[in-house]
Amino acid sequence: MNLLIKGGRVVDPSQNIDDTMDLLVEDGRIKEIGKGLKAPAGAEIIDAAGLLVTPGLIDMHVHLRDPGLEYKEDIVTGTRAAAAGGFTSVACMPNTKPVNDNKAITSYIVNKAAKEALVNVFPVGSITQGSKGESLAEMGELKESGCVAVSDDGRPVVNGELMRRALEYAKGMGIMVISHSEELALVGEGVMNEGFTATELGLKGIPWAAEDVAVARDVYLAEFTDSPLHIAHISTSGSVRIIRNAKARGVKVTCETAPHYFSLTDDAVRGYNTNAKMNPPLREAADVAAIKAGLADGTIDAIATDHAPHHLDEKDLEFNLALNGIVGLETSLPLSLQLVEEGVVDLKVLLEKMTCNPAKILGIDRGTLKVGAAADITVIDPDREWLVAAEKLASKSKNSPFIGRKMKGAAVYTVVGGKVVYKID
């Protein structure tokens, strides 16, 4: 299929482009980018006047729950939600059932995605067998079968020696280690951020030190082994400071945060709202400010949703019993665009964190509109206002703290491999 996207504001950080231009797609790849392009016979034409045209957004941290937990989400519904949110590529975490720690599970995901997914799916394998933190998984096998990174996400690798070996082996194999940095002994029975709100609500708190101590350990291990390391979903001012200092020393560390960590504070838990329960927990206003500062100065490399769908029965419980996690694929873009509205970052910097930076961290050939690249494109209306309604979410699960919130900014077209996979109503 041939496609011409005309007259949009093309913003591609990978090429330092920000101009009103046309984009021509032929045979699933970017054929030409420029002004006044002519549509070939039979080409589909998208009028993008007044809209943003960007490289397809990449979410490097999602939970598709497939295989084994399809009652929460599956590859079809998860990628449908991704497309609705403007994402053309997602990296899916290994805490499936069974855990993605071997070639068979990775191959299942790759093959099912090839047949049924609306967007590109890049599997992440587990660091340890069964994500139990006892012995390393076969990283070489995981990479060969299609994994772009390894992580025990959902749990930390508690054993420091094992984490050291993981970093060393992954370095040799050229695959990224993604750390879920959390000191479980400090977490204890905590269910939300430790602070005034937790005390007021009578809930056990999780101190910021539970994250910071683990981030510091993993940063030092990366420095000691001279290995690349990516730290997932940072939420505290301390994590930002530790990573900023590490980068200044030349440590090969990158990190991500999630939209909820710069959009909400632990006040969202008031009323015992289990849709505001996640791990790491929502923090205080000072942490939100630090996360925004980290995004602004480049300490934080990527924005990823940590899309974590759960069935209503797993959330409609008393707060202590409800599972951690929220869906985020369909609300990430407007929440992130708010950073531009507030002057935290400019549009080019924001898009770096949602396109070329995640692609670079994962080592995938996406996140660019260069001629010859795969035609993964997101067309965005930054001014479109809409209401987050549970019944309109494409995800199988509806566990979002943003239900009922008015949003500004939406994907109007999502194009994967030159094919329009989503068009807004």
UniProtKB/Swiss-Prot annotation:
Q: What EC designation does it have?
A: 3.5.2.3
Please list the residues that bind Zn(2+) 2: D153, H180, H233
Assigned keywords, A-Z: Hydrolase, Metal-binding, Pyrimidine biosynthesis, Zinc
Instruction: Give the binding site residues for Zn(2+) 1.
Output: H61, H63, D153, D306
- GO cellular component: a single term: cytoplasm
Gene Ontology MF: a single term: dihydroorotase activity
What's the domain of life for this entry?
A: Bacteria
Q: Which NCBIfam families match?
A: pyrC_multi (TIGR00857)
User: Any note on cofactor binding?
Assistant: Binds 2 Zn(2+) ions per subunit.
A Pfam family (short name) is Amidohydro_1
Its cofactor is: Zn(2+)
Enzyme class at the top of the EC tree: hydrolase
What does the UniProt record say this protein does? Catalyzes the reversible cyclization of carbamoyl aspartate to dihydroorotate.
SUPFAM superfamilies for this protein: Composite domain of metallo-dependent hydrolases, Metallo-dependent hydrolases
Q: Which family does it belong to?
A: Belongs to the metallo-dependent hydrolases superfamily. DHOase family. Class I DHOase subfamily.
Name by which UniProt lists this protein = Dihydroorotase
Q: In which pathway does it act?
A: Pyrimidine metabolism; UMP biosynthesis via de novo pathway; (S)-dihydroorotate from bicarbonate: step 3/3
Q: Name the residues that bind substrate.
A: H63, L64, R65, N95, N279, H310
Active site located where?
D306
- Please give the InterPro entries that the UniProt record associates with this protein: Amidohydro-rel, DHOase, DHOase/Allantoinase_Hydrolase, Dihydroorotase_CS, Metal-dep_hydrolase_composite, Metal_Hydrolase
Organism of this sequence: Geotalea uraniireducens (strain Rf4)
Kindly state which reaction or reactions the protein catalyses.
Answer: (S)-dihydroorotate + H2O = N-carbamoyl-L-aspartate + H(+)
Q: What's a GO biological-process term for it?
A: purine nucleobase catabolic process
PANTHER family linked: ALLANTOINASE
Q: Where are the transmembrane segments?
A: none
